[in-house]
Amino acid sequence: TGYYLSRCITACEHGVERSHILPFAVDGALLLEIYVHDGIGTMVVDEKLESLREATADDVAGILRLIEPFEQDGTLVKRSRTEIERDIGNYSIVEHDGVIFACAALYPYPEAKTGEMAAVTVSPQSQGQGDGDKLLRRIEQRAREIGLGSIFVLTTRAMHWFIKRGFRQVPPDWLPEARIRKYNWDRKSQVLVKQL
């Protein structure tokens, strides 16, 4: 295996973008490597495949694909393409090899020195790998950079996840006045806040 890895590294050092080591004993290994996102072999690249970054207009379709199942099951509030396009500058994403696996948005309320962390989504196949924590750190960093002293979330299902990360429950009337006006009392979302 060491020999093959060194050959792959040499290939990448000489301009090959990606080189693969495939198990010869698996029938159809080449097809699985090409057509399944995670593949079946070992890939050596001369670049970072995973990135945490701010979203751009090119990411709107990927964000919609990611959040749509969670909107349908009621975990997330429905967002239209137009809303995401309008607010794209608020979103941060985790992508792997061009596919968006997680996202979150920061909606600042500067008059109250707080911001809402919204649309927090990690794809089921990526859950448990730390992408949610990466996004939380990014949102906290962005909030600090613009002078916010806290962030808050509204959640109906993930309260325990946020509490484990330093959030505490507060009543809905804690929300900034502008956010209270939009609060959907029928959803019965829990309001959690974290001081930065």
Language-model features, listed with the residues they occupy:
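Short beta-strand-to-coil "C-cap" segments at the C-terminal boundary of structured domains/repeats
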Residues: V193-L196
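Conserved acetyl-CoA-binding loop-helix of GNAT-fold acetyltransferases
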Residues: V122, G128-E145, V153
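Short acidic/polar active-site loop segments enriched in Thr and Asp
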Residues: E17, G149, R168
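Conserved catalytic-core motifs of GNAT/GCN5-like acyltransferases
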Residues: F152-L154, I163, R168-V191
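C-terminal catalytic "cap/lid" subdomain
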Residues: T1-K78, T82-E83, G128
